[in-house]
Amino acid sequence: MIHVEVVYALPTEQVVFKLAVKADQTVQEIIEQSGVLERYPDIDLVVNKVGVFSRNVKLDATIRDKDRIEIYRPLLADPKEIRRKRAAQAKKEAAKK
């Protein structure tokens, strides 16, 4: 048995499920076993990306002892577009001075 964590972060809270699992289980099996899908039914493993310590992994990947499996939420806004808007606003404010 190995020890892993399944983490899901929301804007208002972060939940961590600590589990002892068999070493040959896949990421998907561990996520299903954790109970996070029952607690947060909006998670769709087809849509949501998953990772281990901030590195994207496939659902059929195996994990190691003390790994942290992270379930990522989709981005609500395009980071490039946000930077463009922020730069345009800063340019307008600089022109007013």
From Swiss-Prot:
InterPro entries: Mopterin_synth/thiamin_S_b (IPR016155), RnfH (IPR005346), RnfH_sf (IPR037021). SUPFAM superfamilies: MoaD/ThiS. Coiled coil: none annotated. Belongs to the UPF0125 (RnfH) family. This is Protein RnfH. It comes from Aliivibrio salmonicida (strain LFI1238) (Vibrio salmonicida (strain LFI1238)). The gene is rnfH.
